[in-house]
Amino acid sequence: MIRFEHVSKAYLGGRQALQGVTFHMQPGEMAFLTGHSGAGKSTLLKLICGIERPSAGKIWFSGHDITRLKNREVPFLRRQIGMIFQDHHLLMDRTVYDNVAIPLIIAGASGDDIRRRVSAALDKVGLLDKAKNFPIQLSGGEQQRVGIARAVVNKPAVLLADEPTGNLDDALSEGILRLFEEFNRVGVTVLMATHDINLISRRSYRMLTLSDGHLHGGVGHE
């Protein structure tokens, strides 16, 4: 599903964010991406969804080489990917419903399809009763769940989560992780970046560890 072959990423000024990263995720797999702040986790996720481009190496997504995508091709890639950030990037002047509907509106979905799929996504994250609320009226955990609903409303093949529990307490973090597991059980490929080892150590999913741009590990853990 996702394959990196000797991928490096350097920024202006010479800072090397990733160096020779190679790994492969199978369709329907769930894995954790760990490492200290600045290790390259966010850069790796941005490379998968085309926000960044590699300096060297190849990236494959669903059998397609996305290393040198043309700008006009990037939207087709991103429609297959749900991206979740620590800062959920919600529009504070729009309702919860409107925030979740944005990807469908951009994709040109019909009004009936938007209503059906937004309601289903909000129901999945337990926020159907908050559809008319504004994000400012929600708790931090609820805001993050709105971000998750927006990420899955397009029924993506892949979910990428960048420190989605970074601002949440242990109980809320556990709830967010269970949501990702539910999506994974129905076939969604999930890659979650986190530095919260205590949260993920109770799971047996594969762990990919970045350190100063180099990838280590990649085997399952107990």
Swiss-Prot record:
Keyword rRNA processing attached: no
InterPro entries: AAA+_ATPase, ABC_transporter-like_ATP-bd, ABC_transporter-like_CS, ABC_transpr_LolD-like, Cell_div_FtsE, P-loop_NTPase
A GO MF term: transmembrane transporter activity
Disruption phenotype: Inactivation results in a filamented cellular morphology, but not in a temperature-sensitive phenotype.
Entry-linked Pfam families: ABC_tran
Keyword Repeat: no
Family: Belongs to the ABC transporter superfamily.
Membrane topology: Peripheral membrane protein
Keywords: ATP-binding, Cell cycle, Cell division, Cell inner membrane, Cell membrane, Membrane, Nucleotide-binding
Binding site for ATP: 35-42
ABC transporter domain boundaries: 2-222
Stated name of the protein: Cell division ATP-binding protein FtsE
Signal sequence segment: none
Subunit structure: Homodimer. Forms a membrane-associated complex with FtsX. Interacts with FtsZ, independently of FtsX, FtsA or ZipA.
One cellular component term from this protein's GO annotations in UniProt: division septum
Gene Ontology biological-process entries: cell division; division septum assembly; FtsZ-dependent cytokinesis; peptidoglycan turnover; positive regulation of cell division; response to antibiotic; transmembrane transport
Gene3D superfamilies tied to this protein: P-loop containing nucleotide triphosphate hydrolases
Entry's localization field: Cell inner membrane
Primary role: Part of the ABC transporter FtsEX involved in cellular division. Important for assembly or stability of the septal ring.
